């Protein structure tokens, strides 16, 4: 029997799809090292060696995405950065503890301003196993996650103009 076109006041539980939404922001921090652009990458705690990612985290209530990205960059890498522009959004669905989660991560391009990569504040050191400047032109192959590789490629394209 087809679904009726009128409003359905009751939908059986077996037809309900519960999807939680998460909104995060992250940064592609770029600087010149030995005449070549490089980006700040992290290896998140608990991930195997060679699992490089971009710094990112959940947007706090009332916080703007760009502010979150700057905060996460500082917390996870130890460096300060200056905003350039928004690069784009990465959208994906994952399952956490049996619950489907729809996630949107807004990424921003930043220029390195100050600080030493790896000088992570003590309260955040448990989140990051390692930090490294990756050559920007190699980052689209070195980053572990597809959406982050796309953001690195966008940053490279933007800085090549």
Kindly give the residue locations of the regions a language model identified.
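N-terminal strand-loop-strand
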Residues: 12-54
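Unchanged
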Residues: 59-150
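C-terminal alpha-helix
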Residues: 154-159
């Amino acid at each position: 029997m087809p679904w009726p076109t009128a409003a359905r006041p009751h939908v059986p539980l077996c037809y309900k799809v519960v999807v939680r939404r998460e909104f995060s922001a992250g940064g592609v921090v770029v600087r010149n090292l030995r005449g070549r652009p490089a980006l700040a990458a992290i290896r998140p705690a608990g991930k195997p060696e060679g699992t490089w990612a971009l710094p990112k985290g959940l947007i706090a209530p009332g916080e703007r995405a760009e502010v979150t990205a700057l905060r996460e960059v500082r917390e996870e890498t130890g460096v300060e950065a200056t905003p350039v522009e928004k690069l784009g959004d990465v959208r994906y669905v994952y399952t956490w503890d049996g619950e489907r989660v729809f996630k949107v991560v807004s990424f921003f391009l930043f220029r390195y301003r100050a600080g030493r990569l790896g000088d992570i504040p003590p309260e955040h050191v448990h989140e990051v196993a390692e930090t490294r400047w990756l050559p920007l032109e190699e980052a689209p192959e070195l980053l572990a996650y597809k959406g982050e590789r796309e953001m690195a490629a966008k940053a490279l394209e933007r800085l090549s103009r």
